Each structure stands twice: as structure tokens, then as C-alpha cells.
């Protein structure tokens, strides 16, 4: 059974009053909901709260879900909007996130250290980008959504997504170029 059909089956169980079905749906999508929210908010607790808000909004809106559509696209649009709303309310703060802690942790091997350093550099670069740029990069590269899927999630045309993604890549490359200096000759 493909993933969307599994989601549809769970939704049908929810609509019939099966309380465990909602738990199953949350379990299936909580990691990605958190990831999308975290990429926009860059704050663990606020991302968790935005993801929870999105699940609550989705639960209320399930009766309006068009089962011919892909559930994940519909749901991640809700997560995206919940995170953007939280971002508007967010106060600028400097916190030590898991990613910062990860960058300072002791690594077992040189290879792991290099991998963690690259990850931390990319995280630091992403922090400097706009939430829109981070969303485009996250959805396309990390979550491997197609341009059409991103267009559905964000309610923006796929041509505009292509342009936004191109510009986001350029801005990320420029931030990395500044961060890494002589280590990087040509990122883009």
C-alpha cells in the first residue's frame, strides 16, 4: 500500500471515531512536521509548538480534506503556515540549539568531525537566510519534494518556486562563501 493510501485509511478511521487512528497519523508525520517548523523557526520548543498547532488544525480540517489529493502536501501546507505564524510572533533571542551543541560535542573520528562541522556550517548559514529561503532549500534538498509538490505546499506557482529556489541557493552559496572564506572557491 502506498503512503498516501495508508494516510487515507487512517483518516477514514479518524472520521469513524477511532481515537488511536489520530495517534497513528501524528506518529507517521511528527518528524517531518517538526523539521519543517524548525527550519523556519530555528527554535526547538517553538517548532514543537508549531507542529502541535498544525496537527490540531489538521484534525479540525480533516472533514474538508479532499481524498484525491496527497495528504502530506495538504498537511505540510498547514505546518508551513503554522510555523510562519509562529515566526511572526517570535521574539529575537539567542539560544543554544541542539545544532549548536552538536557543533561543540566531541567526535569519535575525524570523518565524523568533518561531517558534523559541515553540518554545523550549513546550519549557521541557514540561520542567516530568510524563512522563505530556508523553506525552499529544506523542502527541495532535505525533504526531496518536487517543484510541483513545493508549489502545492506553499500555494505558489512552480515557476515562482523555481526562481525562489534558484535565488535561495545563490544566497546560501554567498553566506557559505563568506563563512568559509578561502576554503571555498566556487560554490555556485
Each language-model region and where it sits:
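C-terminal edge and immediately downstream basic/flexible tail or linker adjoining helix-turn-helix-like DNA-binding
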Residues: 2-3, 13, 121-127, 152-155, ...
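Short, charged helix-capping/linker segments at alpha-helix termini
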Residues: 15-23, 35-53, 158, 178-183, ...
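Sigma70-family region 2
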Residues: 15-16, 42-43, 53-70, 89-91
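Short helix-capping/turn signature of helix-turn-helix
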Residues: 28-31, 39-40, 138-145
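Structural recognition of an alpha-helix C-terminal capping motif at a helix-to-coil junction
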Residues: 35, 49-56, 69-81
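Arg/Lys-rich amphipathic alpha helix in sigma70-family domain 2
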Residues: 63-67, 77-97, 115
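DNA-recognition helix of helix-turn-helix
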Residues: 84, 133, 142, 148, ...
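Acidic, proline/glycine-rich intrinsically disordered inter-domain spacer in sigma factors
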Residues: 100-127
Amino acid at each position: 500500500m502506498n503512503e498516501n493510501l495508508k494516510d487515507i485509511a487512517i483518516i477514514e478511521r479518524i472520521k469513524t471515531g477511532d481515537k488511536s487512528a489520530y495517534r497513528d497519523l501524528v506518529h507517521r508525520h511528527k518528524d517531518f512536521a517538526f523539521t519543517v517548523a524548525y527550519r523556519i523557526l530555528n527554535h526547538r520548543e517553538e517548532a514543537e509548538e508549531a507542529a502541535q498547532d498544525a496537527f490540531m488544525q489538521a484534525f479540525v480540517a480533516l472533514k474538508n480534506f479532499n481524498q484525491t489529493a496527497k495528504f502530506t502536501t495538504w498537511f505540510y501546507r498547514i505546518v508551513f503556515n503554522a510555523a510562519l505564524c509562529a515566526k511572526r510572533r517570535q521574539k529575537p533571542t539567542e539560544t543554544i540549539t541542539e545544532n549548536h551543541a552538536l557543533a561543540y560535542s566531541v567526535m569519535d573520528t575525524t570523518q565524523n568531525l568533518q561531517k558534523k562541522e559541515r553540518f554545523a556550517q550549513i546550519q549557521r548559514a541557514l540561520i542567516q537566510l530568510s524563512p522563505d529561503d530556508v523553506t525552499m532549500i529544506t523542502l527541495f534538498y532535505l525533504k526531496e519534494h518536487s517543484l510541483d509538490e513545493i508549489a502545492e505546499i506553499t500555494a505558489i506557482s512552480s515557476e515562482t518556486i523555481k526562481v525562489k529556489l534558484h535565488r535561495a541557493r545563490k544566497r546560501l552559496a554567498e553566506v557559505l562563501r563568506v563563512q568559509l572564506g578561502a576554503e571555498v572557491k566556487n560554490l555556485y
